[in-house]
Each structure stands twice: as structure tokens, then as C-alpha cells.
């Protein structure tokens, strides 16, 4: 039983890895399930067993990449001078990841088109909870205005996500990026108890 579970986990990881490459290179619509499975020596049956269908595989890939993005953004925030600067750095880092071709294609373009509203994705819900906890501490410490913490967290995360979506969909992402980050910082600054 343990060996079977281990084989299933390995097959799942192989399929996610192959899908990341195929979805980034060809896009979701053009990526063939047969090419995906044969690239890692598995059958369509393995894909269906692990993910239900191609859409389920995309959801697993998006969840993995989006979780990596959140972790990377949190690392950027941890390097900032204080918790407020950390919150701003996390949002800016998330927006900047829209320049990564894999993130751009899979998470910000194909993900919403196939999976729907990103704010409903499990990885986004997890990120929202982390932001809400940070906001609660900033309010308690007097750094932020005493607004509803969940509302503020949802607006901050939504602003970063929508800025990243804008960058990804733009014909000139590198030109749009600084504008998006500047506007995100200005919007967030409105939540400060004592504006900079």
C-alpha cells in the first residue's frame, strides 16, 4: 500500500512538472494530453486518475506556481525594514512576478481564463489569510487606520493581483510594471494611520 501511494505521488509530480513545461511553452489550449503523458512515460489514465481531466491538471499546476509566488513574495517582505514596508514589498514582488513567462502564461493568462476568478483559488485564500494577519498586527500597532482587517487584506491582495494581471496582459509589460507598482504603493499608503 505504501509503495502504491509513493508511485501515485511520483506520477502526480511527473505530470505536474511536464504540464508546467507544456503550458508555459504552448499554452493550455495547445498543450496535448497525449504529449504530456507520453513525455513522462505515463498514460492518459494516470492523468485522469490523478487530476480528473486536463482542467484539473491546470488547477494543480496553478496552485503549485501561485504558492511558490506567495512564498517568494513573503521572502521579499521579510527582507524589508519593518512590517509595513514588508507588506508593500510583498505586493510589489507579486506584481513583478508577472514578468516571468511561466507565471504570465499559466497563472495570469490561462489560469483565470480556464479556472475562473483567481480570488477563489485555494492558493489565493491562503495568501489572503497571511495578509489579514499582517493587517491585524499593523492596525493593533497603530500603523494602519482602524479599518476592517479582512476588507483591507482583500483590497490589498486584489490590487496586487489585478496589477499583475494588467502587467501580464499588456503589450509592453516592462513599461506597465513600474506604473502598477507605484499605484499599488500609493493605494496601500491610504491605509496608513499617519500618511508618509
Regions picked out by a protein language model, each given a short descriptive name:
Residues 24, 48-52, 59-60, 64:
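Base-recognition residues in the alpha-helical recognition helix of bacterial helix-turn-helix
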Amino acid at each position: 500500500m505504501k509503495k502504491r501511494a509513493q508511485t501515485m505521488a511520483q506520477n502526480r509530480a511527473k505530470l505536474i512538472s511536464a504540464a508546467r513545461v507544456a503550458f508555459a511553452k504552448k499554452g493550455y489550449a495547445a498543450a496535448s494530453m497525449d504529449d504530456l503523458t507520453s513525455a513522462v512515460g505515463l498514460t492518459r489514465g494516470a492523468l485522469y486518475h490523478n487530476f480528473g481531466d486536463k482542467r484539473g491538471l491546470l488547477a494543480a499546476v496553478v496552485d503549485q506556481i501561485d504558492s511558490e509566488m506567495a512564498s517568494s513574495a513573503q521572502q521579499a517582505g521579510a527582507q524589508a525594514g519593518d512590517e509595513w514596508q514588508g507588506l508593500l514589498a510583498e505586493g510589489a514582488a507579486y506584481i513583478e512576478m508577472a514578468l516571468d513567462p511561466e507565471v504570465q502564461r499559466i497563472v495570469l493568462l490561462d489560469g483565470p481564463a480556464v479556472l475562473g476568478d483567481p480570488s477563489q483559488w485555494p492558493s489565493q485564500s491562503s495568501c489572503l489569510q497571511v495578509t489579514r494577519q499582517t493587517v491585524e498586527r499593523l492596525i493593533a500597532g497603530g500603523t494602519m487606520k482602524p479599518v476592517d482587517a479582512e476588507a483591507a487584506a482583500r483590497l490589498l491582495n486584489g490590487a496586487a493581483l489585478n496589477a499583475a494581471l494588467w502587467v501580464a496582459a499588456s503589450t509592453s509589460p516592462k513599461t506597465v510594471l513600474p506604473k502598477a507598482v507605484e499605484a499599488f504603493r500609493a493605494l496601500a499608503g491610504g491605509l496608513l494611520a499617519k500618511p508618509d
